[in-house]
């Protein structure tokens, strides 16, 4: 096996439901947006805002060591729930938005767009995690962020390692194009999908994260070898699921790139 070949070896990604996925990269164990609560309702100011409809496929006790949490944002329970907040206390480093880093305190670091941090690998060497744009709704960031808040995506790179993109709650293909210009080809894209909408509440019911067709388009833009979709099940506000993802990627001729995590 040549060194070039090793960069395309497929590493497993375990998907727990919602936006939560676990993978090992350069010897470090990374977890995206931790959500391990049981099904139930979430309230704000006495109003129900979200409903979780299914339990995770495993518990936080199943995780083993977690070195880094990649947290796209801390303000919404479908990205960081009550059990997820408890978990953060035991994780050495949480990377998140600049505002989230200030809210979460000592073990959290916020990354602005294109800001990078280098992390030591257990066997020597380093990986680089770069914060990348994510817009949690339709339109320009300056119009969206005051309503849905800051969100950050992540790109992971390292010598001899595949490039990995974690989109976070992003609805903008223009943001994906910016990321592709800097980092393509991406080996593995963990794409948040599900076509979440809040008709009559947010943005006239427009998408606040990619739908399935857009996820397939994002895969094409990124030139990615593999897409691991997350954030498409277990919550009532997700309007598209597994079947829509498979259909969209099949229509786009990309279904062979879709990794639904059936073998966990």
Q: Which residue ranges define each predicted feature?
A:
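Pre-active-site segment of Zn-dependent metallo-hydrolases
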Residues: 2-3, 28-71, 82-86, 137-143, ...
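Metallo-beta-lactamase
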Residues: 2-8, 66-77, 91-162, 227, 247-264
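Conserved beta-strand hairpin/beta-sheet module of binuclear metal-dependent hydrolase folds
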Residues: 6-59, 147-168, 188
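Structural motif
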Residues: 28-30, 67-68, 93, 127, ...
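Conserved catalytic scaffold of divalent metal-dependent phosphoesterases
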Residues: 31-39, 111-119, 126-137, 187-199
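Active-site environment of divalent metal-dependent phosphoester hydrolases
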Residues: 37-39, 74-80, 101-104, 115-118, ...
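Cap/insert and terminal regions of metallo-dependent hydrolase folds
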Residues: 99, 171-263
């Amino acid at each position: 096996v040549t060194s070039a070949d090793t960069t395309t070896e497929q590493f497993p990604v375990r998907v727990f439901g919602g936006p939560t996925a676990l993978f090992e990269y350069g010897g470090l164990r990374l977890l995206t947006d931790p959500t391990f609560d049981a099904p139930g309702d979430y309230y704000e100011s006495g109003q129900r805002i979200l409903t979780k409809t299914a339990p995770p496929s495993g518990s936080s006790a199943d995780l083993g060591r977690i070195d880094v949490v990649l947290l796209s944002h801390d303000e919404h329970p479908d990205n960081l729930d009550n059990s997820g907040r408890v978990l953060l206390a035991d994780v050495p480093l949480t990377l998140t938005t600049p505002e989230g880093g200030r809210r979460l305190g000592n073990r959290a670091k916020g990354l602005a767009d294109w800001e990078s941090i280098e992390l030591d690998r257990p066997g020597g060497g380093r990986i680089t995690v770069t914060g990348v744009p994510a817009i949690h709704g339709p339109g320009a960031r300056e119009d969206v962020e005051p309503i849905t808040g800051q969100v950050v995506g992540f790109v992971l790179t390292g010598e001899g390692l595949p490039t990995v993109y974690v989109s976070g709650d992003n609805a903008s293909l223009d943001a994906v194009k910016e990321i592709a210009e800097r980092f393509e080809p991406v080996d593995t894209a963990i794409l948040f999908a599900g076509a979440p909408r809040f008709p009559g509440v947010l943005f006239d019911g427009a998408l606040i994260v990619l739908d399935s067709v857009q996820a397939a388009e994002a895969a094409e833009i990124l030139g990615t070898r593999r897409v691991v979709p997350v954030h498409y099940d277990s919550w009532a506000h997700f309007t598209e699921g597994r079947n829509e993802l498979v259909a969209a990627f099949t229509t786009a001729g990309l279904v062979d790139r879709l990794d639904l995590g059936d073998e966990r």
